[in-house]
């Protein structure tokens, strides 16, 4: 999802790319360098006025020889920088980022030289992917790539190394999140929330300069701004993508408002009007999560008054002696049950599973494809709890996606779109938390009856439905920033305008004039595009519904687990193997039979909960 060194390559040049969003090439540096000399990608377009089909094919051939070498180089540097955060690795990261960003920008511009050339469809798609492979394109002027890279590293490091004082201790974000999961003291929650958000205050000036540089680079490539570039990634016009996301949100807003209404009433019952009124928006610090993006940590406050899930997965994992490695081993066994191969030994020896005690690392979970062959890894600071049990299944989704498309040409070694890459593991995650699966693992003694469905669905909604508006507004805010609709002086005010409008969330108190609260979210600090997570939340339910149909499941979607169903696994793998070689609409149809993203699967999954919430909210004044 995110990491400090996503800054390094993926966020400035998505080809080559790294970590869980993307994959890398298969040609080894030794093999490539020992081969006889070939034309380079620069030489292939040395005379753009003479561009021809042959030139285009030579250009793509050169790119696909060069790209795997560069990608492995960048990945290895990035892995070290993420696992050993020091001024030296920051310096190295910035240098490599600048080098690879310049190369990727040059390739994108070279690809435009062939816009009018008649080439075969696969070559045309490769050219288009190269043109839109950038996240933050640097301008061509001398020093711009280096400055942009240094800004990215500075922002990412400020976030990754941020700490706050609390009760005589210096707390990391992980420490703060542990407290926010369980504390029900509104004064403590407010203090921690405000102190963490203060970490982002120094970022605003650097962020504004980064936006200025990236926009200059995007305009040089023919885009109106960087936001327009980002919206061009989805095999449809940029304006069409905006309309698609608006359509999806309109499908989802009613159930979110219902959930918000219910949660607000329960919080009011706990804290009273002085802390959380029965009407209006919800305080951002009361929902068990620093960003109020997922509310599962306050399930104890929101649980139905009648009915129980019947088990605590976190407790069960501890009681059964799980550790971080076992969580990942069990996740691997799920994919193997679908017909996928076991992970190579290098995965187990090369990955980081727990936070080391001797150094600073970027702890947010991420998946890596180091060399486009067998060297796949995850980097995570896993703990034994339900969240990280799910995380293990999620991250391996990225890893198995890398392995599925590793035989594609280098330019096609990526997800059908970035939402697909995030959705794969979450789709498996939907099966991994079902009581049927947990019972097969021996983690629970019996599968609860239908009386447990509402508690189960409410827990799921607090993670999935609660996330949707946040997943939608992060990039809406950035699109406004990139388009200059939101000036630096208004960054924070507009952030909260969007959060209030779509999420119904407000800060716990007045914000200082120099606040830069968006920067308190890692994806803003690292410039990781975020709409992928909104899309992924929708895709995962669409995948789940299709897989359950393939498996012959006839019951409620929330009770379906595809564990052990090789037919569903076969169809799933057919989609994964395509990588980016076909538009995402075709990849989607390969697995689901549907060509458009559709939120109706979410409505199907949560239909029993929607009816229950409507009943619970009968006497409430919903909305804000």
PLM feature segments, named:
Residues 241, 245-255, 415-452:
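Post-HExxH zinc-binding segment in Zn-dependent metallohydrolases
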Residues 227-228, 232, 402-427:
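Post-HEXXH active-site segment of zinc metalloproteases
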Residues 187, 194, 358-385, 392, ...:
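Active-site scaffold of zinc-dependent metalloenzymes
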Residues 17-21, 35:
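Boundary at the C-terminal end of the N-terminal hydrophobic targeting segment
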Residues 7-16:
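Bacterial N-terminal signal peptides
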Residues 45-56, 89, 130, 294-309, ...:
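C-terminal, non-catalytic "cap/extension" segments appended to globular domains
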């Amino acid at each position: 999802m995110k990491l400090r060194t996503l800054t390094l390559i993926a966020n400035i040049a998505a080809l080559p790319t790294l970590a869980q969003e993307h994959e890398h090439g298969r040609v080894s540096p030794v093999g490539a360098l020992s081969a006889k000399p070939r034309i380079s990608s620069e030489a292939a377009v040395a005379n753009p006025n003479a561009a021809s089909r042959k030139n285009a094919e030579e250009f793509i051939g050169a790119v696909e020889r060069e790209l795997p070498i560069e990608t492995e180089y960048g990945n290895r540097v990035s892995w070290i920088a993420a696992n050993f955060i020091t001024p030296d690795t920051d310096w190295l990261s910035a240098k490599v980022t600048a080098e690879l960003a310049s190369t990727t920008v040059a390739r994108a511009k070279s690809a435009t030289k062939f816009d009018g050339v008649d080439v075969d469809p696969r070559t045309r798609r490769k050219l288009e992917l190269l043109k839109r492979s950038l996240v933050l394109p640097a301008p061509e002027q001398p020093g711009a790539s280096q400055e942009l890279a240094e800004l990215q590293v500075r922002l990412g490091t400020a976030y990754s190394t941020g700490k706050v004082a609390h009760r005589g201790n210096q707390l990391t974000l992980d420490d703060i999140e542990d407290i926010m999961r369980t504390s029900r003291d509104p004064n403590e929650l407010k203090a921690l929330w405000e102190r963490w958000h203060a970490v982002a205050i120094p970022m605003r000036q650097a962020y504004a300069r980064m936006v200025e540089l990236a926009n200059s680079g995007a305009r040089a490539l023919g885009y109106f701004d960087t936001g327009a570039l980002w919206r061009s990634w989805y095999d449809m016009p940029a304006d069409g993508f905006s309309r698609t996301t608006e359509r999806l949100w309109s499908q989802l807003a009613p159930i979110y408002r219902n959930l918000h209404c219910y949660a607000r009433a329960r919080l009011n019952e706990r804290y009273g009007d002085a802390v959380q009124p029965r009407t209006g928006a919800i305080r951002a610090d009361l929902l068990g999560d620093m960003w109020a993006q997922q509310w599962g940590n306050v399930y104890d406050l929101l649980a139905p008054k009648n009915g129980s899930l019947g088990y605590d997965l976190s407790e069960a994992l501890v009681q059964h002696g799980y550790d971080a490695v076992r969580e990942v081993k069990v996740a691997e066994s799920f994919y193997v049950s679908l017909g996928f191969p076991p992970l190579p030994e290098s995965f187990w020896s090369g990955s980081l599973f727990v936070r080391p005690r001797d150094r600073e690392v970027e702890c947010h979970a991420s998946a890596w494809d180091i060399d486009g062959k067998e060297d796949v890894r995850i980097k995570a600071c896993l703990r034994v709890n339900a969240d990280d049990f799910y995380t293990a299944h999620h991250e391996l989704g990225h890893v198995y996606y890398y392995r599925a498309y590793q035989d594609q040409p280098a330019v096609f070694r990526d997800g059908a779109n970035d939402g697909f890459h995030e959705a794969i593991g979450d789709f498996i995650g939907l099966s991994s938390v079902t009581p049927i699966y947990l019972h097969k693992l021996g983690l629970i003694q019996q599968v609860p009856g239908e009386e447990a469905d509402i508690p189960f669905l409410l827990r799921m909604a607090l993670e999935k439905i609660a996330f949707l508006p946040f997943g939608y507004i992060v990039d809406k805010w950035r699109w406004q920033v990139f388009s200059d609709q939101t000036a630096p002086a208004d960054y924070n005010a507009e952030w909260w305008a969007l959060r209030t409008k779509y999420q119904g969330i407000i800060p716990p108190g007045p914000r200082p004039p120099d606040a830069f609260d968006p920067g308190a979210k890692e994806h803003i600090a690292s410039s990781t595009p975020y709409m992928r997570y909104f899309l992924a939340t929708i895709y995962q339910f669409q995948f789940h519904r299709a897989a359950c149909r393939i498996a012959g499941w006839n019951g409620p979607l929330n009770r379906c687990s595809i564990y052990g169903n090789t037919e569903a696994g076969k169809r799933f793998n057919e989609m994964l193997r395509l990588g980016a070689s076909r538009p995402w609409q075709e990849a989607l149809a390969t697995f689901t039979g549907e060509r458009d993203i559709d939120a109706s699967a979410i409505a199907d999954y949560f239909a029993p909960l929607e009816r229950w919430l409507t009943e619970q909210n009968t006497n409430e004044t919903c909305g804000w």
